[in-house]
Amino acid sequence: MSNKLFENGRFFLGCNWWASHAGTNMWQEWDEAVVEDDFRRLADAKITVVRVFPLWSDFQPLRMHFGGGQTPREIRLGENPLPETEAGRAGIDEIMVERFSTLCDIAERYGIRLIVGLITGWMSGRMHTPEAFLGKDLLRDPLVVSWQVRFVKYMVRHFKDRVAIAAWDLGNECNCMSSGLSRSECYVWASQITNAIKAEDASRPVISGMHGTLPSDASVWNSRDLGEILDVLCTHPYPLFTPHCNTDPINGMKSALHATAESVMYASTAGKPCFIEEAGTLGPIVSSEKIAGDYVRASAFSAWAHGLYGFVWWCANEQSALTHTPYDWESIERELGFFRIDGSKKPVLESMSELASFIEGLDFDALPERITDAVCILTHGQDVWANAYGSFILAKQAGLDVTFA
């Protein structure tokens, strides 16, 4: 199984995944049989890439122990001193490492390639922070960042020889883990984590894992900066959360082109490959299952036709039966899966399987380079996304293809 996810030019279709029985609690409530069944069903449906998340608070369960006057005294693994082992020095729970290794074994058996979101401290509207770091700035505090670097270096060093792993991801939307950062502080954090990954494994691409970055001076998480640091950029183009997008029916032209337009803007302005790492309708509050299937058919096909690398759905499984946070906080997190609670397929998965079969049937791996008719120059002091998106849509209506600078 090749792990060259962004080099052979073949478009991939994938999903973000939490185990169907437990969601974000899967590492604590580990069930190998469920994980195996999840991956078997995904492989049967022609899903070839899965983004997975070693939850930060489970894998690095550090706790600060305090002395008199609430003086910080010692970081431990729960109540136990840090062992004098490689894992102990990184603050890693070795039981979780064994479970992640089993996950890699299962992925290899089913020919599924993994994107690993390393610093997953934010997920679906809830923070998952090691107790030792509660109340600290998770992207600026030197104590926190030093332990993040140890965590990343250990995980990458330990798993870099696993065939199933195709790419490393900084983590899930790490720009949601702090606020008030300067552009320079964002640059420094992203560089530190990327350099920690590459110090252990220079053979695999590193992906941003971010959402809502822009190539504008006003964006502190700046996609041009991330293009300097990282190998691959990504978009998380949910219409509900993206300015100027939640205006039309989800199966209309404007919505269908949103993910492509945003990804083309990132790739062309940053000079790095881009793919759609999280796509979704956010469930029945936005559209019916049938209309969601129509949306995916148009959006994923558009991404392929424009030379993007892949389309990854959020997410594999419905989570409407789960009662822990964030699922009992957020109605939009509960009914997003390919599979219903009873295991039956939704139209979204049928649409993606159909596109996978279509691409498999072609006698070439990659489309020729996209021909563009014009360049839209995004200048300083403007709403770059409004202008890029509007220009992209208007150009399509006029029969033109544009890129951005």
Feature locations, PLM:
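Mobile, glycine- and charge-enriched loop segments
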Residues: 1-18, 266-293
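Active-site mouth of glycoside hydrolases
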Residues: 2-230
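Short, solvent-exposed loop/turn elements at domain surfaces
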Residues: 20-27, 243-244, 383-385
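Short, flexible/disordered intra-domain loops and linkers
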Residues: 28, 65-71, 179-184, 217-218, ...
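Beta-sheet entry/capping signal
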Residues: 49, 113, 166, 205, ...
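Charged helix-capping and loop-helix junction motifs
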Residues: 97-99, 255-259, 290-298
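Glycoside hydrolase catalytic-domain groove-lining segments
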Residues: 183-188, 192-195, 199-285, 318, ...
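Carbohydrate-binding surfaces of carbohydrate-active enzymes
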Residues: 269-270, 280-285, 290-405
